[in-house]
Every structure is written in C-alpha cells, then in structure tokens.
Amino acid sequence: MNLNATILGQAIAFVLFVLFCMKYVWPPIMAAIEKRQKEIADGLSSAERAKKDLELAQSNATDQLKKAKAEAQVIIEQANKRRAQILDEAKAEAEQERNKIVAQAQAEIEAERKRAREELRKQVAILAVAGAEKIIERSVDEAANSDIVNKLVAEL
C-alpha cells in the first residue's frame, strides 16, 4: 500500500474538520436537538395533563349535572306538594264559604218564614176580630161569642 502525501493531507484535513465540527458545529446542533426533544416531551406531558384535566372536568360536569337533576327533582316534588297543599286549602276554604253561605241562606229563609207566619197571624187575628164583630152584631149572647173568639185565638 502506497501512502502518499495527498492521502496524509486528506486524513489530517479530515481530522481537523471533525475536530472543528465537534467543537463548533456539533454542540449547537445537539443543543437544538435536545431543546426540541425537551419541547416535545413537555408538549406530550402537557397533552397528558390536559387529557387528565379534561377527564376530570368531564367527571365534575357529569357530577354537577346529576346533582342539578336531583335538586331539580326535589324542587319539582316540593312544588307539587305545595300545589296539592294550596289546592286542599282552597277546597277547604271553598267548603267553609259554601257552608257559610248555605247557613246564611237557611237563616234568611227561616227569618222570612217567621215573618210570614207573624204576618199571617196578624191577618188572621184581624179577620177573627172582624168575624167576632159581625157575630156580636147578629147575636146578643156575648158569652157564646167570647168562647168562639177564645177558641180562634187559641188555634192561632
């Protein structure tokens, strides 16, 4: 094998080139690669955290939705109970009002009946007195007439 100066010069130039690259070119490239690897790793970990946060948020949203539905159901049940209570109170109040009106009407009917009876008694008494006067005019026997008048008054 023949080693000449050209090959030796090329070998020295190659070694110098490699040393130059290792000293000045390789560190910035490695730094850029490491920086990019770190950014990718950070991005992946950030994506993992975001995924976990999303799952947690979805879980929380589901829980809150369930709680809201339960609270809404409780509120609806309370509203239905209150509605039933109000209806019962209104029915009871209406029943009391009806009973009051019926009692008042019956009292008015009874008062009107008493007034009519009293008016009728007065008219019968007037007629009895008029009849007694006619009887007295026709007959002289006062004792018999007074018995008749007393019987009429007793019947009234």
Swiss-Prot record:
Pfam families found in the cross-reference section: ATP-synt_B
Record keyword Signal present: no
Binding partners and assembly: F-type ATPases have 2 components, F(1) - the catalytic core - and F(0) - the membrane proton channel. F(1) has five subunits: alpha(3), beta(3), gamma(1), delta(1), epsilon(1). F(0) has three main subunits: a(1), b(2) and c(10-14). The alpha and beta chains form an alternating ring which encloses part of the gamma chain. F(1) is attached to F(0) by a central stalk formed by the gamma and epsilon chains, while a peripheral stalk is formed by the delta and b chains.
Membrane topology category: Single-pass membrane protein
Family classification: Belongs to the ATPase B chain family.
PANTHER family linked: ATP SYNTHASE SUBUNIT B, ATP SYNTHASE SUBUNIT B', CHLOROPLASTIC
UniProt entry keywords in alphabetical sequence: ATP synthesis, Cell inner membrane, Cell membrane, CF(0), Hydrogen ion transport, Ion transport, Membrane, Transmembrane, Transmembrane helix, Transport
Name of protein: ATP synthase subunit b
NCBIfam families: ATP_synt_b, PRK05759.1-2, PRK05759.1-4
UniProt GO MF annotations: proton-transporting ATP synthase activity, rotational mechanism; proton-transporting ATPase activity, rotational mechanism
InterPro entries named in the record: ATP_synth_B-like_membr_sf (IPR028987), ATP_synth_b/b'su_bac/chlpt (IPR002146), ATP_synth_F0_bsu_bac (IPR005864), ATP_synthase_B_chain (IPR050059)
GO annotation, cellular component aspect: plasma membrane; proton-transporting ATP synthase complex
Function: F(1)F(0) ATP synthase produces ATP from ADP in the presence of a proton or sodium gradient. F-type ATPases consist of two structural domains, F(1) containing the extramembraneous catalytic core and F(0) containing the membrane proton channel, linked together by a central stalk and a peripheral stalk. During catalysis, ATP synthesis in the catalytic domain of F(1) is coupled via a rotary mechanism of the central stalk subunits to proton translocation.
